[in-house]
């Protein structure tokens, strides 16, 4: 059995949210939420005393919070001037600390394949020289459905794919894929790659993660750390999360990039590290990181950002507009690529079709959320 809730809205809020359903949760803090006595259908909705609201359900065992520690919200705070690329871009009030979502709804969208694809595009756009042969070493790359598309977007890249899982069969016939190793990235293989790619421009992308426990996260972080120190890539993009095993966690210093279309309460980011020369280290604090990501996920992601680009399954939320900005940057840097020779709206449509199951899931989620807005 589920619990049913409504989030009360005013007319101005309701009007803008009709076109921006990903932004609904911005207004749905504790003081706006009421528990409903009945499930919602076409009959019970007519009996509701509220005229503007969003309804949703939660598992019966969901706990309650009595008071939010987030800043007071208002309609004028919904709109923001610029997107946030990194965690350093977020200036956080020290009074904001992480607390569980509990009865509050989530209206942002989680699409793992789209998240991974856009993070990879961002990394290659910023760190793969356009006029130089680039070798991309990629442990954790199976099944690799999106890599076929990436080889078209970045033709200067040659790919070394490593994963014990099964790879997409078409990758074996792609001339840009120079090596596929159906195995773990062992110390022996790391040394082999170091030797064969000596004096080559190298990028390391790591997407390893089997289990979400803090012990496993620490183990994966240390594996990535070892690979960077041995391979010495020009840059590495590492799957990054601070384990809660100690208050201060010593790890690489780098640029901590936010992800688009991550899980609604995710603290995972992508850490980009310069692998040549003396590698800088940093003392990370998981509590600080959790607080920043909590504020980002609850307030900044569902805020409204300016764009003139339209598509039937996206709106003005942070994830959607950050994707638009990234594609605009790609179009400017690679104007002659076939993908760039269309409007941004059509670029979005193309990539949604090329990434497995993404368009259906994105549009279904968009329309389902919109349907619950009354």
Residue ranges and their predicted role:
Residues 143-154:
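Conserved SAM-binding loop of SAM-dependent methyltransferases across substrates and taxa
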Residues 161-166:
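Conserved acidic E/D residue at the C-terminus of a beta-strand in Rossmann-like folds
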Residues 210-297:
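C-terminal substrate-binding/active-site "lid" region of AdoMet-derived donor-dependent transferases
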Residues 167-198:
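S-adenosyl-L-methionine
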Residues 59, 63-131:
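Class I SAM-dependent methyltransferase Rossmann-like catalytic core
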Residues 198-207:
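Short SAM/SAH-binding signature in class I
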């Amino acid at each position: 059995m589920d619990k049913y809730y409504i989030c009360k809205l005013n007319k101005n809020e309701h009007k803008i949210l009709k076109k921006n359903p990903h932004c609904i949760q911005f207004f749905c803090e504790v003081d706006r939420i009421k528990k409903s006595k009945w499930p919602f259908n076409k009959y019970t909705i007519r009996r509701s005393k509220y005229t503007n609201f969003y309804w949703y359900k939660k598992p019966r065992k969901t706990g309650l919070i009595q008071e939010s520690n987030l800043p007071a919200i208002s309609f004028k705070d919904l709109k923001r001037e610029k997107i946030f690329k990194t965690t350093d871009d977020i200036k956080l009030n020290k009074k904001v600390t992480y607390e569980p979502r509990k009865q509050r709804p989530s209206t942002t969208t989680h699409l793992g394949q789209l998240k991974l694809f856009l993070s990879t595009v961002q990394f290659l756009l910023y760190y793969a020289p356009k006029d130089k042969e680039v070798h991309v070493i990629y442990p954790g790359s199976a099944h690799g459905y999106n890599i076929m598309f990436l080889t078209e977007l970045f033709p200067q890249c040659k790919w070394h794919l490593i994963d014990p899982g099964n790879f997409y069969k078409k990758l074996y016939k792609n001339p840009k894929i120079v090596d596929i190793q159906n195995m773990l990235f062992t110390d022996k293989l790391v040394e082999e790659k170091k030797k064969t790619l000596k004096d080559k421009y190298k990028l390391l992308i790591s997407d390893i993660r089997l289990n979400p426990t803090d012990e496993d996260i620490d183990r994966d972080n240390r594996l990535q750390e070892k690979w960077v120190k041995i391979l010495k890539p020009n840059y590495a993009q590492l799957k990054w999360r601070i384990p809660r095993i100690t208050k201060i966690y010593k790890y690489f210093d780098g640029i901590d990039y936010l992800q688009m279309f991550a899980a609604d309460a995710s603290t995972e980011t992508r850490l980009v590290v310069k692998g040549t020369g003396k590698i800088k280290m940093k003392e990370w604090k998981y509590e600080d990181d959790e607080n920043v990501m909590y504020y980002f996920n609850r307030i900044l992601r569902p805020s409204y950002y300016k764009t003139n680009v339209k598509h039937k399954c996206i709106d003005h939320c942070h994830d959607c507009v950050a994707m638009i900005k990234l594609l605009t940057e790609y179009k400017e840097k690679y104007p002659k690529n076939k993908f760039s020779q269309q409007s941004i709206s059509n670029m979005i449509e193309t990539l949604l079709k090329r990434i497995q199951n993404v368009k259906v899931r994105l549009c279904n989620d968009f329309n389902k959320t919109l349907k619950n807005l009354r």
